[in-house]
């Protein structure tokens, strides 16, 4: 008896994978000029198509709202005029970045006479699985183009209209630059089986990059048969040290928590050294109270915040110290030392982004060395943990793993190094 034919979804994904693999060969050989031309064309297409993008995004927002999608997801789904402008600007910034492909480093002559070094090359094909944020479509496309990779993108069903409209712009930009249209492809189905196939096609896909909820990322990490660049959540800490400038500490802590609640680099936990707690906590507590931020407190912190008018105070549970809220909620605890702060961050944090606010340079340097996170900051908001802010032009994700790529993943995170050898007829003896 013959084996059954592949399901339509598997057949579809195999076609996308085969096309991406073929396109990746052309992209690896593409000139910097052609790649930059595609990126600049994409920026023009985004600006020219802003009204259409807004209209398609409104369709997605209407469906999401009627379906009762969680508020943070709806917030991530929204394409505001500012977001559309930033997408175009991001393409231009990526075009302006140096092309990493073909860069050779660490060239050295060996006693045998050969010269050995390393060359930066594209990974090949990456698969992207993401929820809500349709701007990720442009981030992924722009970085794929500049890094000489091909990409297969599978956005969330809630953003289908937005992503389809954006992908049409990408295809036009690739064509204008003479690059293969299959270099960036959008999975044209909301069938979840497509994700299962995408993460299990090592013959076509070299790496998977998931962006979304913890459940999605855990599933992909468990089921993928290709490498995964990932982070599970963002329990980011701000630690106010005994040596903090309190005006700075109030300003930075406020921004880290309230500038936007839904991103994974927003602060979720606040640690305060006992020596400055009485002076600092009522001030930041008043800021949080004015903005409706719920404070889940340890007992010492709660006592110092009790007199703040309008403060929403809740006794913290053990679960709160590790929670990513993505909402106007923050956990607050007093600590007795820098050692305790570092230990708590490494125990309860998610190895994403953590900040120390201090004027004590030795303490700052200890924090940088000993906090085991992908991004560690001194006197700056955790909200800066972003490829755009780090000068990467755009980011395709953030990795909290310790191999290959760590932190915001930009162009170099989509490349690898291969060994190259130059000789003049040397043979091994």
From Swiss-Prot:
Subcellular location(s) of the protein: Cytoplasm
Catalytic activity annotation: L-glutamate 5-semialdehyde + phosphate + NADP(+) = L-glutamyl 5-phosphate + NADPH + H(+)
GO biological-process terms attached to the record: L-proline biosynthetic process
An MF annotation (GO) of this entry: glutamate-5-semialdehyde dehydrogenase activity
Keywords in alphabetical order: Amino-acid biosynthesis, Cytoplasm, NADP, Oxidoreductase, Proline biosynthesis
Family recorded in the similarity comment: Belongs to the gamma-glutamyl phosphate reductase family.
Name of the protein in question: Gamma-glutamyl phosphate reductase
Organism: Methylibium petroleiphilum (strain ATCC BAA-1232 / LMG 22953 / PM1)
Source taxonomy: Bacteria, Pseudomonadati, Pseudomonadota, Betaproteobacteria, Burkholderiales
């Amino acid at each position: 008896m013959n084996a059954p034919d592949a399901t339509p979804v598997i057949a579809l994904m195999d076609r996308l994978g085969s096309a991406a693999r073929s396109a990746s060969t052309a992209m690896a050989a593409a000139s910097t000029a052609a790649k930059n031309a595609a990126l600049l064309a994409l920026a023009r297409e985004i600006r020219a198509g802003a009204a259409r993008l807004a209209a398609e995004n409104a369709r997605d927002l209407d469906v999401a709202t009627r379906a009762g999608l969680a508020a943070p997801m709806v917030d991530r789904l929204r394409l505001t005029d500012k977001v559309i402008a930033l997408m175009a600007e991001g393409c231009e910034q990526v075009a302006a970045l140096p092309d990493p492909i073909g860069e050779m480093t660490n060239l050295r002559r060996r006693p045998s006479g050969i010269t050995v070094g390393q060359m930066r090359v594209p990974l090949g094909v990456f698969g992207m699985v993401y929820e809500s944020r349709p701007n990720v479509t442009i981030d992924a496309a722009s970085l794929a183009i500049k890094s000489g990779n091909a990409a297969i993108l599978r956005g969330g069903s809630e953003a289908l209209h937005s992503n389809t409209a954006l992908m049409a712009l990408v295809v036009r930009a690739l064509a204008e630059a003479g690059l293969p249209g299959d270099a960036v492809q959008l999975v044209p189905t909301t069938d979840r089986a497509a994700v299962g196939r995408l993460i299990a096609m090592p013959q076509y896909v070299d790496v998977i990059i998931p962006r979304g909820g913890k459940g999605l990322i855990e599933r992909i990490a468990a089921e993928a048969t290709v490498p995964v660049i990932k982070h599970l959540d963002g329990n980011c800490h701000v630690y106010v040290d005994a040596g903090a400038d309190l005006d700075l500490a109030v300003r930075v802590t406020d921004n880290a928590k309230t500038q936007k609640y839904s991103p994974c680099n927003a602060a979720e936990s606040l640690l305060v050294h006992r020596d400055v707690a009485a002076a600092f906590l009522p001030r930041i507590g008043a800021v949080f109270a004015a903005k409706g931020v719920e404070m889940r407190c340890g007992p010492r912190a709660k006592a110092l915040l009790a007199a703040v008018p309008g403060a929403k105070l809740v006794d913290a549970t053990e679960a709160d110290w590790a929670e990513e809220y993505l909402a106007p909620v923050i956990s607050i605890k007093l600590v007795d030392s820098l050692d305790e702060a570092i230990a708590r961050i490494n125990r309860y944090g998610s190895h994403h982004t953590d900040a120390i606010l201090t004027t004590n340079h030795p303490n700052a340097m200890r924090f940088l060395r000993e906090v085991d996170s992908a991004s560690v900051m001194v006197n700056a908001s955790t909200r800066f943990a972003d490829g755009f802010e780090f000068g990467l032009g755009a980011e395709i994700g953030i990795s909290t793993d310790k191999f290959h790529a760590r932190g915001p993943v930009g162009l170099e995170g989509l490349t690898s190094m291969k060994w190259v050898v130059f000789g003049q007829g040397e043979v091994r003896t």
